[in-house]
Amino acid sequence: VVVGEWGDADPWAAANDDAYASLLAHVRTGPRGPVPVDLDALGWEWGTPRGRVRAAAARLEDLGILSRRPDGSWWYDELSDADLSDTLDFWVALVGPALRATIPALTPELRAELDRRVARARTTAALRLPEYPTAFSAACQFWFEHSPNTLVRSLGLRAFERMRWARVPTQLWSVHEVHTWFATTSRAVESGDPAVATAAAEVMDGLFEVHRRNVGIPRTHRPADDTTEDRVGPVGRTLLRDVRSGALVVGSTHRLEDLVTRTGATPEQVHGALRWLHDLGLVDDGDGRYRVGQPSLATWRDTMELLTGVFTHGAVHVLPGLRGPALEEFRMLVARARADGQVRDHRYTESSFAVTRFLSEQSGNRWVREALRLAMARLAYALPEAPAFRQWDAEALWLTLDAAAGSGDVETARAAARRFVDVARAHVDDVTARWGTMGS
């Protein structure tokens, strides 16, 4: 195995930026698709190492505009209306977590940068200048670019790239009436109140509804089984077992070829497994070697914030429209979680998270489903032992969820989502306080 031939476990590492820009330019200046893309030929033409080109392809695969077929060939195509609809929703789902994570970390320098971006966006919006869409995007992306939550930052920047490059030419932001968004985010910054940040995220959700109508991208209502996503395979499970058991020691480094020998799998399978472990926060890479990371409370906390965004999306866009067997199943799950909490049953952790899992699995949004699976896996493996959920007094949450289910009432669903955010933050505070007694 040639060192670096398969690319990095993190294709979004800065070292791959040049190859990404070249590959993106190549596909966007060619036919709309679907068209094949010869990565080896392009790498030779550009004089770029094979691993860099593959990493660039993996980025475009993450965005959904490049796909790999069973025969190993790569194909480019624009996002469908349904996938673009999902993309808009997923970015909005991350706005709340980004605001809640970034506002407490603002320095005077960052405040000044934010003020400059907001002033530029306000001015260009009022004057209807052609640079307004770019200025507005810069003001919004501030919250992701400077977020201390590395997971939300990474997913948010990728989601923005997906919106940006989904179509040729790029579909521009179309809503000029954005005063309420900037006023609410300003109030969130001044007050430091997470509830105001949540309210700002709800304003952005409303702006995107207007944008959808303006550009003709209706909301997706496809069934959950109409989406496609990669699931972890046996090689990933094998390496996860070795990391969790200590067979692969924390801090140890390994070459790809050594892991190929260890697992008996192909380099491509091992590399895919390493990408998954990297996404879980368990593996880092550099110079062709892979390092087993240290489980951390920071990784767990970041993931809980992501979970609030995923849950909010499910509550608002799935819960009001539940019908038939799905509605019955959801109410059964809520009743079980409520009952387990009332008697402080040890099953409460699983029954509570089953409610979250159900909402996102009911969504036909592929990006939300993938983020949910990522969040649940990180919560399970970010710490040496997954912490118990001990928010016993969550009666108001369960009752509001039950009331919102199948009601057709989005406002009741939003109220349930806000209660979930509060309960999740209390869970984070509880686990943070207990961390010193939870083992190494």
Where are these regions (language model features)?
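Short linear motifs at protein or domain termini
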Residues: V1-R100, P104, R212-H313, P320, ...
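Amphipathic alpha-helical repeat elements characteristic of tetratricopeptide repeat
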Residues: D17, A21, V92, G96, ...
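Regular secondary-structure segments
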Residues: L24, R28-P31, L99, I103, ...
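Short loop-to-helix capping motifs
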Residues: L39, S147-T150, G192-D193, S363-R366, ...
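Acidic/polar helix N-cap motif
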Residues: S80, R128, G192-D193, S296, ...
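Helix-loop "lid/cap" segments that line or gate small-molecule binding pockets
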Residues: V95-A105, Q141-P148, F311-G321, R357-G364, ...
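Conserved amphipathic alpha-helical segments that form helical-bundle/coiled-coil interaction surfaces
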Residues: E109-T170, F182, A199-V210, P325-P387, ...
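C-terminal all-alpha effector/ligand-binding and dimerization domain
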Residues: V168-V232, R237, P384-S440
